Amino acid sequence: MSAKMMFSLGVAAFLFAGCPKSDGNPFTPEEGAGSTPQTPVPAAFVGTWYNGSISLTNFYNPTTGEWSNAVGSGSFYRFNQNGTFEFGWQMHVSLYGCTNIGMVYRRGTVAVQDSVLVLYDQYARVMAQDNCSASRNYDRPGTISTETLVIQPGQDEWGNTGLYIRAPNTDYSWFLQNR
């Protein structure tokens, strides 16, 4: 082996040996494993929570690629005890004979630390339909991303139990539990 190759291998071995190991904290995950952090979700957050007027029935089927044909606008989060989540967003607007529909579906894992949830997408899909301009229609993979939420259980003015959910540095939005 050439001296240059030996030097390169030595530098690579040094850098690899010096890589920090995971400290077990899901908020500092190891790189390159292909998996995303996942912790159990506290019972107070487990369930399907919605904001707005959105149908949660067959919102999106990842197996068939079919979207629901429901109307309304809103979003939902579904947090499972095993540390997984689903998110859906829908906007349905009709004006001057044109109907525009936009939908987003994401699923993945969640890491929880107190009232902070970090959502790690493993799958995302977006769809848009415009009945007045078919060239604007699409159904494609969404951007895989990470989302941080701050969650606070609470009660609205009518006594309904729900979650106040916000992104850092934003105001809370009220989400009711789907029962």
PLM features per residue range, with description:
Residues 15-18:
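C-terminal motif of bacterial Sec signal peptides marking the signal peptidase cleavage site
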Residues 1-7:
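Bacterial N-terminal signal peptides that target proteins for export
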Residues 20-106, 111-113, 118-179:
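Lipid interaction determinants
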